[in-house]
Amino acid sequence: MDLASEITSATQTSSLCSSGRGHAGYPAPGIVAHGFETHGTARVAQGHLLPPCLLPPPQMPVLAALRDLSRRGSTSSSRSPSRPVSTSASKPCLPASCLGETWSISINLVGSSGHLQSPGAQRDAQRETGCLGPSWLPHHQGRDEELSLSHSAQGEEF
């Protein structure tokens, strides 16, 4: 009797979790009201089903890996595999609200690192070519003092 009630309460809580709507939660109090034993098993079944629904352990390594990739600067290679990884990690048995939160977090990490680092690297490359290209030609013809001043100014800029 206990196993059967535990299985039915477990299937109802899992259907509630997979659908993300409260309609599947209404039959659960009817099962709990049958007796004290079913109330205890329903509480145990819900306790066992809550960690897979929230998914705290798989999400944290994914976010940490995204941060490590964004720090290294390889945003072009990390942008394409990060979206399938985040969807596959958040698909099993998540409510709609949790799914939206984890999806927006992964997009924000990838989007911010991609937009901040790749144009920044291009701007640094343009600065080097723009400053060094014209500035070397006149300074070789001019004085050595101007050359040393340009070196100190470039050191402060970077």
Swiss-Prot record:
Residues 1-18, 111-120, 149-158 have a biased composition (Polar residues). This is Putative uncharacterized protein MRGPRG-AS1. Disulfide bonds: none annotated. It comes from the Eukaryota. It comes from Homo sapiens (Human). Residues 72-90 have a biased composition (Low complexity). Residues 1-20, 66-94, 111-158 are annotated as: Disordered.
